[in-house]
Amino acid sequence: MTTHHTPLYLISALALAVSQGVHAQDEQETKVQAKQGLETIVVTGVPRRTTIMASSSSVSSLSLEQVEVSTPRSTAEAFRIIPGVRAESTGGEGNANIAVRGLPVASGGAKFLQLQEDGLPVMQFGDVAFGNADIFMRLDNTVQTIESIRGGSASTSASNAPGGIINFISKNGENESGSVSTTVGLDYDSVRTDFEYGTYLTDSVRFHVGGFVRQGEGPRETGYTSNKGGQIKANLTKDFENGYVRLYYKHLDDKSVGYLPMPMYSNGDSIAGFDAQSDTPHSALFTKTVRLNGENQISSGDLRDGMNPKVDAVGFEAVFDLDNDWRIENRFRKSSISGNFNSLIPAEVGSASSIAQSIGGVGATLSNANTGEAFNDELAMRIHTFDVTLNDFGSIVNDFKLTKSFSDDTSLTFGYFASTQNIAMSWLWNSYLMELKGDNAALLNVTAADGTEYSENGLYAYGTPYWGNCCQRDYDTEYDTRAPYVAFSTKLGDVSIDASARYDSGEARGNYAGAVTSTVDMNRDGTISIPEQNVAGIDIANASPVNYDWSYSSYSVGANYQIDPSLATFARISKGGRANADRLLFGKVRSDGSVADEDAVDEVNQFEIGVKKRFDSFSVFATAFYAETEEQNFEATSQTFFDREYEAKGIEVESTYFMDAWDFRGNFTWTDAEIAKDALTPEVVGNTPRRQADLIYSLMARYSYDKGAAGVSFIGTTDAYAQDNNDLKFDGYTQVNAFVSYDLSENLNLALNVNNLFDTVGITEAEEGSVPENDIIRARTINGRTTSVTLKYAFN
């Protein structure tokens, strides 16, 4: 399968320069390749299977081979080559911020975009605090294709997905294939083995099984094995004359470090002793934390757990063609999800003496918590632990669909979607002091001028008093969603028309509790230290109820005009919605558990018009779009609520070009977005939403030769504002990735991959909106250069 991207003149020039060595391919084969892209069959977000050329939606399909060119180090990095999608993948293996077509990322996660596996949502809400959907999924060799749909047609295809859908479609044994590969980091600590195999057991029974295991420190220095675990997925299919039944299983237990904003200068330069591209505040000298758990019992947390999703999912899929042109489909999944999210965020980076005196008073000093030696550096960090126990994020999802075909071109679909999503977690945060250092930083103790100790082993507070003890919290909630929907499609001559509607309703039930302080002998030594005088725990006795309902209607109407076999144009108008979940708590939920109707749901209105053109070896897919978005949200790191509206317009272009053994792909998205209304901070009205660049792009070239392939990708962005006040601005950047592979034998391949070849600095987010007096900000950047080698054996 292929996708289509903007032609890249730079890569074209490179191709011409080296084309003397190209092994010429048959001209007809090139034409077939070019045609195949727009004729690719897609199933995600459409009422019935269709081709990209015939669809009135913006859809794309990526194979693993196409993803390989961008050399992703995480699942979210693979999303960066999808047109219209802005994936801030600097959080590690998960915890990415993902936006689509100017729809905002006001807090984190992927609020208006749904991530799916085999047609069902991984999480019903894509922006759960510390539970972003990408944390609970992994890209490996069990994936056949990554399909995406952008724009309003997703509004009626899935609940809470008005901006789009990204769907991982698994291999199912239909084509016998298998492989085992091991990838080793050459300049970073990582070893990963992937495996997969699928085939027919009988003429009508087939299976596929695969997954990965890995271990290592990862692309940044943490001082310990921070990435460890793996995944296994399996499916079994029974084919019948008129359909099939498929069973699924997935087990994921994978620890990976979560990268949060880190200290650097406002221009992206590193601070002495802390490399912004390869260091973290994580340290082998700081791996454990003691706190009160969600039941106010003394317990310990392990920072080495990082983001540790524990997922067990089972499901089935049944599709049958019945008499009288009826077709029935049902997809079901039950997921048990729990785990941890443990990481470190610098709440303050500043003068060591000022931080010490803010805790211990005038004359207070700092010392190394391990050695007791006086600490005389100018800078230090006030660290908060993002210590979150994911008690229950399990879900049950079912999507039923019944279709009546009246002809080859006309069909009517009725469907009913139902899901239950649990969101139960405990925030158990503490406060520490650390030296500003990237290689196993030490914890710091603070001592008053009179010798009084204000901390123990670097901990100066059980809780987060610097943030008003905001973040000792317990959530125990359940969200039920029900959505009947209908879709109609027909063809009148050269014009294909589709219309769909969906009615989402749901209810939120449960309770939540905030912080309360008390005196607790946390280390059980019989004495009460200063930090133990005010220990933050959960105010269980005064938990607040969650008891609200929501409902909203969605529609989407589109038309595709096939002007000739190689040219088509389309248009669409849509209205969708997004129910708000956990981020309403501690702010928008009333004392009786109810929520105002306007806060419960955010609506999105979208308009798009596009054109698709195919030449012998070149194809282009261009879409102009406009969106109006409502937003209610809450951000944990800044303790900020949002209540605003956005407007965004832009152009999305996707194209592909084949030339002999060369395969060129690229896409770019130009977006002009602004904050149209803001009920809480009206001074930002008219400003550009934070982190929204005017232009994002992905450009790739792949060259295939007799014994392998080589490729290069350019992934970049123009400059963007750090925050909505539009003061501090990040520079744009282009990240270059490259790979080369060589067949050692018929089935044995060796590949070299380089991510961020030129060690480019690229900032994706920052906590500060303006440059502080000391010029130090807390930001996330893309990782520095990492190089790996993969040995892969294919048995097929």
Annotate the PLM regions.
Residues 27, 492-494, 617-635, 641-725, ...:
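Gram-negative outer-membrane beta-barrel transporters
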Residues 153, 165-200, 209-221, 713:
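Short strand-turn segments of transmembrane beta-barrel domains in outer membranes
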Residues 226, 237-239, 244-315, 340-388, ...:
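Acidic/polar loop-and-plug regions of large Gram-negative outer-membrane beta-barrel proteins
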